[in-house]
Amino acid sequence: MKQEQNSFSRLWTYLRAYRLEVCLSIFLKILSVVMSVVEPFVLGLAITELTKNLMDMAKGLAEAGLNTSYIAIIMTLYLFRGVLYELGSYYSNYFMTNAVQKTVQDMRNDLSHKINHIPVSYFDRHQFGDLLGRFTSDVETVSNALQQSFLQIVNAIFTLLFVISMVLYLNIQLGLVVILSIPITYFSARFIMKKSQPYFKEQADVLGTMNGFVQENLTGFNVLKLYVREKSSQEEFHDITYHLQKVGFKANFISGLMMPILNGISDLTYLIIALFGGLQVLAGRLTVGNMQAFVQYVWQINQPIQNLTQLAGQLQSAKSSLDRIFQVMDEPDEVADVTETLSGDLTGQVSFKNVDFQYVADKPLIRNFNLEVKPGEMVAIVGPTGAGKTTLINLLMRFYDVTAGSITVDGHDIRHLSRQDYRKQFGMVLQDAWLYEGTIKENLRFGNLEATDEEIVEAAKAANVDHFIRTLPGGYNMEMNQESSNISLGQKQLLTIARALLADPKILILDEATSSVDTRLELLIQKAMKNLMKGRTSFVIAHRLSTIQEADKILVLKDGQIIEQGNHQSLLADKGFYYELYNSQFSNKKAE
């Protein structure tokens, strides 16, 4: 309960900035509720006057006649009430929508700001889809709860309060009957909701399973056809849909009992009101108009009770979403940045001095590692999958800080440099080339927003991608789609090389050309990378040892440890792990 209160109280800190709109919305909603509640009473006055006139006429009284001026006043009040009700409802929603949308905007902006300041380790621990869900569906759930549930709660609470006040004002005995029906109606509705909720949750889970199954089968449709798995796939899908049908039936059957039960309680209340109310009308203690007002109030009382019951589930969902949002916001930021900035460009001299590192406490990954890299040198990092090649890059880029020792660039401890200034000195080209939705020109200019069109073309030529770009519809102005699927993987990598050239970094992080490209494109990528590495300190993640024989230094990693380092010739002469790797690749190549 404490966590729930904390989540909603933190939400109020966002809404508080727009408390004027929120207060106006609540005031106008209460106004519309009042106008709705007085409707039966106003109509009752008119009905009382009409029935009184009819009874006088039936008795043959000489003074019998319709008091038209009184009826006109009542009808005017009724129309005025209707106008106030509509205006109150409209502007209540208007002000609340305005406040909610601003609140959601602030929340998303804070999430975006937080994402830019949390350490990279957070992304290693959480799936991308989970984080995306917090940005989109969780924030949207909170938005819907604020915009719909909040005003519905206000409407339900004040409707109940005003209806109770009116029925007690009109007749205490009948009012107590109406009040007695409220807890019976509420707990009946809550009982049904509680019984049906697990089935609705199971229905949502099974629906998610079905969606995942369909997506998986559509994605791998060719493989499905190749291995003649259509029948088994259809049988599995049938099992899922059968489960969905059974659960859906139970959920809707139980929840479908709500209205008949609530209507039954209402009918019983109507019966009691009609019986005792009719007796009081005959006794002259209750007018016909007030009697019909009672009947309408019984009807008005059901809807807010049902809404409050259903809103409990919506608020629980909103609370869960708020918890997930604030979990991100409560993540610790990166270690506070320093104000020391680089006085000029780096030359690219890199030193690892007695470096220790561990992702998890008491589980060291790198111990007492030392390395000196001169400006312009090429350092290759090799090793089997999972050896820790990415760890060195993470340390160099300062995505993680060393546990002990230091990494210096041009004599500066990188922990004492502004991250922004430091990372601007780097260029990165990986196999998983990242391009965003936009034109090719915008993608190339990503690392240097001030680059001219001429500089963009020169960088593309140096990356051997200019000719390819000009063959595309629109050339440099061609729009990339969201997944960049309208160009191949190798072409993406050439574009990222051109982007790195345009940014003119002093230190490079490179991945070899993806093995899925054809030989001609692979040669173009290798040539473009050589152009990119000229005069720059380069760290190359190597997969095929035949491509790094010219490296000035080769680091050999195994099980997270740097077990060998040297150049190609010296490592072969040592006949260690590198020698075994090289010979195994060479043997496999010959066998092919």
Where are these regions (language model features)?
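Juxtamembrane loop-to-helix connectors within ABC transporter transmembrane domains
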Residues: L15, M96-V100, N116-L160
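Alpha-helical segments in transporter systems
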Residues: L20-L45, I74, Y78, N93-T97, ...
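ABC-type nucleotide-binding domain
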Residues: D337, S343-E592
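Transmembrane helices of ABC transporter permease
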Residues: E21-V34, Q148-E202, I273-L286, Q303
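Transmembrane helix-loop-helix hairpins at lipid-water interfaces of multipass membrane proteins
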Residues: C23-G88, Y169-Q173, G284-V288
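Cytosolic ends of transmembrane helices, especially the final helix of ABC transmembrane type-1 domains
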Residues: V206, R229, F253, Y270, ...
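An intracellular "coupling" helix at the cytosolic face of ABC transporter transmembrane type-1 domains
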Residues: Y14-L20, V120-S121, V139-L146, F150, ...
